[in-house]
Amino acid sequence: MSVQVKICGLSTPETIEASVSAGADYLGFVFFSRSPRHLSYELAARLSGYVPASVPKVALTVDADDAMLDAVVEALRPDILQLHGDETPQRLVEIKARYGLTLMKAICVAQPEDPLTAAIYRDSADLLLFDAKPPKSMAGALPGGNGLVFDWSLIAGHRPETPWMLSGGLNAENVAEAVRITGAEAVDVSSGIEEGPGRKTPELIEAFIRAAKRA
């Protein structure tokens, strides 16, 4: 079975169509105002129409309150909510009860103990995403999409009960090695398919998906 691929931070019909044509398994859309990939609700609603029903839509938010999540769900009609902040297991329980959607919780990794955090979400998250934790010294760092790679050996022997996805600085050149070291069955990419902040290209998308599927 080939590695599953999530393309995150999409913002144009062209890149959505390129992702679908190349075989993306998930399409991600960002709702976080500090991100260059942030979407207005109006644009998200329009872009949603370009996504086939067979490809799950993922809405990424960061410590969003109910009012914001209501607006995101109304605009995008996502299949999955990706929670990329400091949301607690109890907050996930509340979100699940309110929307009934699949929940993906990001776990940011920099130290050996960080992957162990996944255990506290065992009963509340449907999916996990291991991403690179930005250093405190990094000016303007985002919760994700910084192009940072973490030490993949930190999760090489880590097998959480919850299905998981690998993220953090992946690109067409390093994704095969990342999969080999971690054993990841699914990968997530954003900055690694951009020619500039938030500017994805069909060519980079296709190259990444091709490399990931061959890994």
Swiss-Prot record:
Keywords: Amino-acid biosynthesis, Aromatic amino acid biosynthesis, Isomerase, Tryptophan biosynthesis. GO terms for molecular function: phosphoribosylanthranilate isomerase activity. It catalyses: N-(5-phospho-beta-D-ribosyl)anthranilate = 1-(2-carboxyphenylamino)-1-deoxy-D-ribulose 5-phosphate. It comes from the Bacteria. Coiled coil: none annotated. It holds the Pfam family PRAI. Signal peptide: none annotated. The keyword Translocase does not apply. GO terms for biological process: L-tryptophan biosynthetic process. Belongs to the TrpF family. HAMAP family: PRAI (MF_00135). This is N-(5'-phosphoribosyl)anthranilate isomerase. It comes from Parvibaculum lavamentivorans (strain DS-1 / DSM 13023 / NCIMB 13966). The lineage of its organism: Bacteria, Pseudomonadati, Pseudomonadota, Alphaproteobacteria, Hyphomicrobiales. The gene is trpF.
